[in-house]
Amino acid sequence: MRKFTQFVLITAAIMAAPSAFAEMKIAVLNYQMALLESDAAKQYAVDAEKKFGPQLNKLKNLERDAKALQDKLVSNGSKMSQGDREKAELDFKQKARDFQFQSKELNESKAAADRDMLKKLKPKLDQAVEETIKKGGYDMVIERGAVVDVKPQYDITRQVIERMNQLR
C-alpha cells in the first residue's frame, strides 16, 4: 500500500508540473540489491557460511537422527518391548528438544551477525549513494520498489555497487 501511495503521489506531482519535472534528473535505486551485491556483503556471506556451517551441519545430523528414531517408532513400535519403546520415545523427544534449542540459538547468532554486518555496511552504502547522486547530478532518486517499470539507463544501482566496492 505504501509503495502504491508513493507511486500515486509521484505520478500526480509529475503530471501537475510537467515543465518543472521535464528538466529534473530522476534515477531509480534498488537499495537492498546495492547492499547485498556489494563485495563486502558477498564476503560476509562466505564468512558466515564458514562460521555457521558446522552448526548447521550439526542441526541437519540431529534432524536426521530424530527422523530415523521416529521412523523406527512408527515401523517397529508395535513389535518393541514396552521398555525399548519408551526409551526410543524419550530419545526422540530429547533430540527434538535439542534440535529446537540449537536451531533457535543458531538463528539468534546469525541474526546478530547480520545486524552487525548491516551496521558496518550501511554507512558505506549511504556514502556511495550520496556520491553517486552528486556525481550524476540527480534531482530525485526513487526506491526501485516504488516504481512499476524503469528503463535501465535510469537505474543507478550498479553505479552505487561499484562505488561502494571502491570505498574501504
Swiss-Prot record:
GO molecular function: unfolded protein binding
Single Gene Ontology BP annotation: chaperone-mediated protein folding
Cleavable signal peptide: 1-22
Xref: SMART domains: OmpH
UniProt keyword list: Signal
The family this protein is said to belong to: Belongs to the Skp family.
Name of the molecule in the record: Skp-like protein
